[in-house]
Amino acid sequence: FPLVLVRADGPFIERTGGVAAGMSGSPVYLATEHGDALLGAIGYVFPNADHRVALVTPIADMRAADRGWPPARVEVPGYGEAVPVATPVLLSGVSTRAAALLEPLFGDARVTPLPVQLSGTAPADADAAFRLEPGSAIAVSLISGDVQVSAVGTVTAVEDGRLLAFGHPFLGSGAVALPFVPAYVTAIVPSSEVPFKLANVGARVLGTIEQDRPTALAGRLDREPPTVAVSLSLLGSAGEQRYAYRVAADERLYPVLVATGALQLIDRALGATDGGFAELAWEITLRGGERVNLLEQVNHPSDIALAAAQLAGGPLAVLAANRYRGADVERVSLNVRLDDRQRVASLEEAVLESEEVAAGDAAHVHLRLQPHRERAVVRTVTVPLPSDLAGEVTLLIRGGAVPRATGDLELDEKEIDAPRTFGELLDALRSRVQASELVVEAVT
């Protein structure tokens, strides 16, 4: 699509040092004999160059925001390669390391490195008085509640209940359903790289961003999209703490967003980066009422908060990636029990009570386990053997968190039950082996 080269000028631009991150979508008008005509929106700038020089995305291309992708590069002779005006990602109550979990979401997006800023929450009366019009600041909300993550840009046009903004993609995800809320710019910080905005974010959902395309974000007013409600309970030495937040109900996003919120809140509860043990219990509710309950454990020698947070998004990633149907996750209730002790043991020795066992009988195996900095313990497990076994049988013994490693042994693929329907996938999630369990497999 074509872009229009412009030079921004005037007292405001002089004060800000040029086009700032967060100004993307700012409407540009041309004076005509019939009055001002909307040319388009500020969309692209040249990094480490004159910040007053920018490229405008034409309004006709923004109105056709469902068209195909543009070239991967936008280059202007004499100026070099242009990049989209950086979109500030505003974080409220999110640490730098929790924000790092978000990086995969922005890795393929056609945006410049994002200035990450702490934001505040605007008062309710400001939301009530907010007017959505060209030039207004809005925030596309990814997480809201006790954790907030949103991206700030500018409205280009509001036409017949439809909104156009940004003048370039945000994540480049195509068809989306993301809520947008008011944003209130508090300051513009000059910078030699790219000036950027500081802003507070409102809570009132103004509508839904439905298209995240190369030329614009396009959305509808007064239409609130579905979100995933997350309730998080943390139980540790300081007692129980409860939190709540909502994340975008996009399968490409919610596993990472849930994990990001969990890491921030676990970090806040622990107050330190240290090793330990965590037990996670999920209740995932799908639209229609079906529930998936899971229990899992994780141990880490140096960073239990990060390990638990990454695990928190695991079942959601499985649901999001399934090939059978949309998961339609509605709610996630997550209870996390934290312990600063290392609750892990290594399997030091396994001894068969008898090396000869009749088919259909059970093999008894004595295991010596070495817990972390505690006395070794001996446990005996009983392994029932099928009646049709004959010849030499190998017993594979591992912890539930250890993947199957068979070496030169050949496993019958028919014995490895892979889900074939969405219902079977849910059953597999419910019954999957926990990290605290021992797995003994007989292989012929």
Predicted regions and their residues:
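Terminal presequence/propeptide segments associated with secretion/organelle targeting
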Residues: 1-444
